Amino acid sequence: MKCFAQIVVLLLVIAFSHGAVITGACDRDVQCGSGTCCAASLWSRNIRFCVPLGNNGEECHPASHKVPYNGKRLSSLCPCKSGLTCSKSGEKFQCS
């Protein structure tokens, strides 16, 4: 009986769901607004989102420093904001 109830709930969820809408999706930096870049998703490199540029103390990718970048970014991290640099801090890279 418990399994039957779970199946009914699952079918109701499927019937009333409308699918996911991805806002801020992009392919390249030029599609994003000022102060953002088009970074790859952590879950799938084929999905990209407009993400804010890194602030002081936030994690960054050392090879990803040009905005707008003409190609497709492979990193899920944006470059640092203007005036900040991406430098190694312990085990990771941070904007400073």
Curated annotation (Swiss-Prot):
Keywords: Disulfide bond, G-protein coupled receptor impairing toxin, Secreted, Signal, Toxin. InterPro entries: Prokineticin, Prokineticin_domain. Gene3D superfamilies: Lipase, subunit A. It is found in: Secreted. It comes from the Eukaryota. Residues 1-19 form the signal peptide. Its main location: secreted. GO terms for cellular component: extracellular region. GO terms for biological process: endothelial cell proliferation. One of its GO terms (molecular function) is toxin activity. Expressed by the skin glands. Disulfide bonds join 26-38, 32-50, 37-78, 60-86, 80-95. The keyword Chloroplast does not apply. Potent agonist for both PKR1/PROKR1 and PKR2/PROKR2, and inducer of a potent and long-lasting hyperalgesia. Also potentiates capsaicin-induced TRPV1 current when tested on DRG neurons. At subnanomolar concentrations, this protein both induces potent chemotaxis of macrophages and stimulates LPS-induced production of the pro-inflammatory cytokines IL-1 and IL-12. In vivo, potently stimulates the contraction of the guinea-pig gastrointestinal (GI) smooth muscle (nanomolar concentration) and rabbit aortic rings. Belongs to the AVIT (prokineticin) family. PANTHER family: PROKINETICIN, PROKINETICIN-1. This is Prokineticin Bv8-like peptide 2. It comes from Bombina maxima (Giant fire-bellied toad).
